[in-house]
């Protein structure tokens, strides 16, 4: 037992303060799980002296769900001091104290668990951030910017850049169903799969087809993911795109912004799936925007969606800006639209502008 002792002001406690759970009057109450009244401690062999003035003692176990979590112990300098009234009153007090002590213990345990969880989540956030590659610094003939905002510490949105060579780049954006740690882990698996396929220099439709098979083999808790994948060929200025259920990418070209209207099944649901591929030759100033549904489907306080139309108008209005400026303008406008409300969904954005 760990002892907490109160005596009269100015008096010292002498004697043994450490004891096994079965020793002394306190130990007897704990062992028997019932009150122990000792009228004269000097004739009771179980007594362990703490205060030489003690003549009688009352020990009442504090029980919680049939388990002794402590003992309420009172000592008196008078012989035969404690009565049945003391036993009844203090038994009620001991029961209430037991509940309070257990609640305090559970609160402390909860606080420790929450602190550990927070440390784990922060570590997961750092790891996830490290998995997302920065925009390439090599000259692929594109200005690029990527933005990533999580509704929680970690999320299921992802983007990736695959270097196919000095002239060719793969660009991906994906969204795992659900949120939180499980979605983030599944997203990390998807990034690993893409990187393992990169040496094959797969074009978009074939990349999504192979990812669908590999993601499906590693499906966790019924999760799936949407993804959009594109390849860019510098020199030829050729863009190829395929889509697996992701928000349709946007393309600013010839003075207007429109959707690249490609559809396809999300990855990891059906085994044998093929994907359509669309290609276009781009010119300087053309802009490609990949975006997760957390942008267009963001709602304001009046239950209005930000919407793809608003997003396309923004791109048209700021088409002369850099890729970085366009990405920042989009996120600022979404924040303004929602009055800076907390994120209800992850927001991920990749902007590529042809130099």
What is each model feature region?
Residues 1-17, 21, 166:
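GAF sensory/regulatory domain recognition
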Residues 8-12, 32-59, 76, 268, ...:
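Signal-transducing coupling segments at domain and membrane junctions
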Residues 26, 60-78, 100, 292:
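Sensory-domain boundary capping and coupling elements
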Residues 42-44, 55, 71-80, 176, ...:
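Short beta-strand-to-loop transition segments that serve as allosteric relay/switch motifs
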Residues 55-64, 84:
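A short, aliphatic-rich beta-strand micro-motif
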Residues 91-98:
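Allosteric cytosolic regulatory segments
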Residues 109-289, 339-355:
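… and, occasionally, acidic/histidine-rich disordered N-termini of signaling adaptors
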Residues 208, 228, 281-290, 295-355:
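C-terminal catalytic subdomain
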């Amino acid at each position: 037992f760990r002892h907490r002792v109160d005596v009269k002001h100015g008096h010292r406690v002498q004697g043994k303060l450490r004891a096994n759970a079965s020793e002394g009057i306190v130990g007897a109450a704990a062992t028997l799980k019932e009150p122990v009244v000792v009228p004269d401690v000097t004739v009771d062999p179980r007594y362990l002296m703490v205060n030489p003035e003690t003549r009688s003692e009352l020990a009442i176990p504090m029980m919680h769900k049939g388990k002794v979590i402590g003992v309420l112990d009172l000592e008196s300098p008078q012989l035969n001091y404690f009565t049945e009234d003391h036993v009844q009153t203090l038994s009620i007090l001991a029961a209430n104290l037991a509940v309070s002590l257990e609640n305090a213990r559970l609160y402390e345990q909860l606080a420790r668990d929450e602190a550990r969880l927070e440390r784990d989540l922060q570590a997961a956030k750092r790891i996830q951030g490290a998995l997302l590659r920065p925009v390439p610094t090599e000259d692929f003939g594109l200005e690029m910017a990527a933005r990533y905002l999580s509704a929680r510490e970690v999320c299921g949105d992802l983007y990736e850049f695959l270097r196919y060579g000095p002239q060719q780049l793969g660009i991906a954006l994906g969204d795992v169903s659900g949120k939180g740690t499980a979605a983030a882990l599944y997203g990390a698996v998807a990034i690993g799969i893409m990187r393992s396929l990169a040496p094959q220099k797969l074009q978009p439709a074939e990349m999504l087809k192979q990812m669908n098979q590999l993601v499906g083999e590693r499906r966790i808790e019924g999760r799936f993911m949407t993804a959009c994948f594109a390849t860019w060929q510098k020199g030829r200025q050729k863009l190829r795109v395929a889509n697996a259920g992701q928000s349709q990418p946007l393309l600013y070209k010839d003075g207007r912004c429109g959707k690249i209207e490609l559809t396809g099944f999300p990855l990891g649901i059906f085994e044998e799936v093929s994907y359509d591929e669309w290609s276009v030759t781009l010119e300087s100033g053309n802009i490609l925007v990949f975006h997760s549904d957390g942008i267009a489907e963001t709602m304001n306080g009046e239950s209005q969606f930000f919407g793809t139309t608003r997003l396309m108008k923004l791109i048209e209005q700021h088409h002369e800006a850099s890729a970085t400026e366009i990405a920042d303008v989009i996120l600022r406008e979404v924040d303004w639209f929602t009055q800076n409300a907390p994120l209800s969904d992850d927001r991920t954005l990749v902007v590529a502008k042809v130099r």
